[in-house]
Amino acid sequence: MNGFSIIIPAHNEASVIESTLRSIIASKLDRALQIIVVANGCSDDTAARARAVAGPILVIETPIGSKPHALNVGDRVARYFPRAYVDADIQLSDNALQKVVDAFKDPNCRIAAPTPRHDYTGHNPLLGGYYRLWRSLPYVRGAIMGSGFYAIDAELRSRFTEFPALTADDKFVRNLTRPEERRVVEGCHAVINMPETFGDLLRVKTRWTYGNLELASARPDLNVNDQDRYRGVPTHLLMRPWLWPHVPAFVFIYLYTRNAARKKIAQQQNTTWERDDSSRTISRETRPAA
C-alpha cells in the first residue's frame, strides 16, 4: 500500500506539538499517513499532548535527549517512502503533503521540501529588516534546508545507514544528493516562526553555523563549503538599494555567529537542542499557515 511516513523528533515541545500535528493531519493526502513523534529527553508533557491529538500518530518516548538518536528511533518503525523528517514547531499549508509526495513522481527526485515561509510578523523593525534581507538571498530562496521539513525516497535513504551524531541532519542528507535530485516545491509552504529577539537569533544562527562547520569537519567527503553561497551576495545587494540599511545588522550577525561557532568547535561544545524559545511562547494556534 502506498503511504507517507513522517518522523517528528520533539524535545520539550509541549507548547507547539499539538498545533503542528493538527496542521499535518489537515494537509490533504491521497495515501496512508503514518506520523511518528519521538519525544526525547523531555521534562514536560510533550508525549501526552501528542497522544491527545486524534490521527494516525505513534508516540515513542526515549530518555536520551538527542535529535539524531530520535531520528534513528523513528526510522526503525517507519513503514513508508517517501519519508519526511519534520520539526515540531512548523505549520503546513493544506496542500503541502500532497505536493511534496507528487514531487517524487519525477524519477530523478530524491529529496523534496515545501517552500519555506518565514514569519516575523510583529518583530521589531531592526530584526524585520534583517529577515527581509536574509530571505531575499538566492541561497535562502532555493534551499532545501530552512523549511523545517524535508522528505526523501528509499534510494536516498539507502545512501546512509543511520543519522550520525551531527547537528545539521538536513544538510547531511541534502549533501548526499546532486543538485538535480533536489526539489523545493512551489505552490505549498511550511511556516517557520523566526526568533523574536536578537539574543535568540544569535543563538539559533550560531547553532546553524556550528552544524555546518561540524559537518564539514566530520564529513569532508560531502564537499560542504558554505563560503560558496556567499559569493554572489555583494552583487545581489548592490542591485537592491532598499536593502542597504539592513546590511550592517546582516554583517554583524554573520561575523558574530561564525566566530561563536568556531569557538564552540574549538572547545568541542555540544549545541544539541539549542533553539529559539521566543517563537514558542505563544500558542501556534494563533498563527495560521495560510
Describe each model-derived feature in a short phrase.
Residues S23, A39-A47, I64:
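A conserved acidic beta->alpha catalytic loop
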Residues E61-A78:
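Glycine-rich, basic loop-to-helix element that forms the pyrophosphate-binding segment
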Residues N12-A26:
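Short, well-formed alpha-helical segments that are part of the catalytic scaffolds
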Residues D94-P125:
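Conserved donor NDP-sugar-binding/catalytic core segment of glycosyltransferases
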